[in-house]
Amino acid sequence: MIKGMEKGALKKLRKLLSPKKKADKEWYLSLLDGQAQRAYEEEHLKGVLSMLKVFYLSRYRRKIAVLKAEAEEIRRGENYTAADYRTLIEKNARIAAEEKAMGGYKCFFTEPYFARMDVTDEKEGYNSYYIGKKGDVNLEIVDWRAPLAVRYYQKSRVEFSINEYDYRTVLRRALAVKNGKLLDFKNEYLSVRDVLSEEEIAGRDEEILFDPYLRSIIQSRKDDVSIRDIIQTIQEKQFEVINRPERESFVLQGCAGSGKTMILLHRLSYLMYNNENLRPRDVLVITPSDSFNAFIDELSQVLELQKVRTVTLAEYYYAVLKNEGIDLKEKLCGERPDPAYLAYLYSERFPADLKKKVSSLYGDLYGLFAAAECREVTEKILSDCRRRQESYKRVKNASLRVRRAVLGEMKDKGEGYYFTKPFRALMSAFTQAEDFLGFVLNEPERTPDYFFRLFVEFYRAAKQIVSSAETVFTRAQEDLSALGETVRREIVDLKRYRRKQGEEEILTYADRIARREELLGEIGAVSEEIGRMKEGCDLFSELFSVVRMSGACAGLGRCADSVDVARWLYRETVQSYKRRYGMKGIYECDGYALCALLAEAGRRLTPRYGLVFVDEGQDVSKSEYDLLKKINGDAAFNVFGDLDQNVTPWRGLKSWETVCDKTYRLDRNYRNTNEIVGFVKKEVGADMTPIGLHGEEVVRLRLSGTTSFFRGGQGLKAVIAKEEYLPLFEKRGYCRPTSGGLSKTKINVLTVYESKGLEFTSVAVYDRGMTENEKYIAYTRALSRLAVVEGT
């Protein structure tokens, strides 16, 4: 039983937190009374915190106290043993686990909920629900991703159905709760006209269906060093995207500051919450940079997305290749590729050239065996291979001494077993040749990659056959001949032994002699069989000599495994393309090139995912999307981006139609102040609408005044410039981004591309040499303070 609380007080607490309300006229009148509602919300918050302490913290504290006492008793005990030590380790582990579990409820103290929604229905009556980042049954808090909480974001819908219940919304309220205090609340929607008269309402209801609290919440978080959590500020239009069906593929085109990345993460969290079968390993999130991954890490933890794989596109290519045994990342040369080559690589000409070349390689090789003028020879060789296998069966079924003469003995050499004679290995080579030729002549065509790998095995087997068949068969016949001589001598020796049977002298070992004479016949038959196996080897050698001298056959034939096949394909295609531009070595872009090559050859690449999210999707070329869809053939693709933010002349998209048929659009800027949005619209003609947040005017300043601009400012700071001008900002207090993320104390110095998707309280843009799109991106990284730096 709960200690320190009277039953009556506990009952009152549960009644307060219960969503079930007796909604009489007095209740509805109280909804219109601001002071009464503040008192109610404060009492409710107090009740939540009390219940939190009673049901959770007290329980954990008691457990921890007991465990600590037990641990202390063990420490103080006499004759401390190894068993006591193990028990103490277990106690400490349990203490740590209980403390961690107790820490999981910290979020309920910080911000237990952010909204309240009152609804009525004919079956359950009036219920008041509180919506939070995490749900809890005892605290009567509904998780924001739950079906009922979803309706909070659908501002224009006041009536809705869930399962068999038909609900009508009475109240939709935004709440600002922080560290156990109610800071403020605002009614987004309040409809009491069904119960109260116009005189009683007196204009105090709220029928306006938009989010009046959005501006104030964002404004209050504008200078927060940590990432802004906009769970409680999601607009209906945004949430329409968040709760699209799981298998729907779409593009979200949004202007700068419209919350595209937040929508991506919230959608993923929403889908995983509502589908228990959707596991983190089923989802891939492609982001623009490692700095961006670090930037969104805090929100990912809030939304419980830590286990979802978040990588750059280059890292995904590396992971795919690593699964193929190719560690490309370790071989990068560090040089910059020729822009002309990149323009070719990310254009549609590159995959077209790959397709043509791979098809040519495949066709040429396949034709050596299956073309009309070659087919008759191939069929004869295949027939010979099958005939040899029948003969080989007879050899294997021969008596022990004959088998050993031909096949040798099986011995153990530590790492495994081996045969003392090469006959079996030769016949295994003939089996591989037979399998390959049978596939080429009789089975449906498969992928080029499958054929290439089969060809490697055939080439290796054929090389062995050509180099050793004549010798092995001849040696086998010689060994059989030697065995025959031995058997004949044995017969002569056995015939020397005689005994009398009556008046007649008979052979003592007549049965042994008979068996050996039978063995001689078997030896002769097997020798003739091997002689027939030798027939046709010359024709096989002729075919192989033609194959060896044909085009790329020798190069492919030297391959040992699938990795070597990939290298051979690379040399025949990508490497030769790079030579045209005078490029040597391995570049980051080779990850895409090699993945595209292997996919074109038909190799089944992994890892594969069921859901693929792409942020800053305008920077990914059409051919890359085609590759991603080929690798992840069953995946739904959700692409988030802004066509106006594409800054790579050789990569990216001009239209979303090449990616997906369905496109949603957002044009309201939630990130920047009116002054910044107005400046950007004037400078680059951007199509976006501000939400009315006011801040400082945009300033222009000399290079020497950059440091002064940031002095005394709070929040994240950044200088954004073209790469060739970054050295201008190599000074004390400035820093380049690292793998650990952005600096919260120094001024971050970034290129335009590195800044994509990020946001800073104060930004100075050195826009010399920037394109319109680059300026658009750089200017809109500023939350509230923007300076344009001029001069040198």
Residue ranges and their predicted role:
Residues E246-F250:
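Pre-Walker A (Motif I) flank of P-loop NTPase domains
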Residues G257:
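Walker A (P-loop) phosphate-binding loop of P-loop NTPases
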Residues M1-N243, A482:
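Extended, charged low-complexity regulatory segments
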Residues L252-G254:
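Hydrophobic anchor at the beta1->P-loop junction of P-loop NTPases
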Residues M272-F613, Q618-L627, A635, D644, ...:
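Alpha-helical nucleic-acid-binding subdomain
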